[in-house]
Amino acid sequence: MTTGQLVHINLGKVRPLRVGERKLMSAIGKTPVIGPVAVGLLGLAGDEQADLSVHGGLDKAVYAFPLAHLAFWQQQRVTRSVSLFEETDETLPPGFVGENLSLTGLTEDAVYIGDRLHFADCVLRVTQPREPCGKFNAVMGYAQAARDMVQSGCCGFYLAVERVGTLQSGETFELVPGARQMSIAQALAPKRHKHMR
């Protein structure tokens, strides 16, 4: 049995994001919240998405991300001199890459499409890896960030809500295996060619 912990729940509101000379609406930078958060079929109460053609919906209701990956992304920014912090040993804050759930105990190679995360009061089902867009480049501060996400596999994964309820930061969950035919890492691999350009 695989178990993990929900360390942070992160919510965001749609706001302007500068992408080059353009200003686009985005909710990518999310903030950790304290207290129970209601989980509905379309996601977490109080969380927003700007472009519903590519974000949100039943199969992308919640975005989960291994908390340890934030250190990798901070290092990418430091390497390119776009660090948020002067200290190179600090990691980016939870929610920075747009994740709703900051998790420990799972990585993309150990999570499969169809697996279920059983929390005390709700059940979430793994649906697909995150494939980043240009807004991710803007938030990270360098033009190859989306490519680096796909190449590194440090992408996180989307979840559908199978049983509505509530989530609480700090609670544990159990990973219940599905058919185990394709891991998140395997599902992301075919997208690497697209992001080589």
Regions found by a protein language model. Name each.
Residues L101, F157-A160:
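A generic structural motif
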Residues M1-F119, V123-K135, P177-M196:
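Electropositive, beta-rich accessory/interaction domains or terminal extensions
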Residues E90-G98, G141-C155, M196:
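Short, basic/aromatic beta-hairpin or loop at an interaction surface
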Residues G114, V164, Q168-E171:
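Loop/turn positions that initiate beta-strands
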Residues C154-C155, E171-F173:
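A structural signal for small-residue-enriched, beta-sheet-centric alpha/beta enzyme cores
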Residues N137-V139:
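Short, acidic/hydrophobic/Gly-rich beta-strand patch recurrent on exposed beta strands
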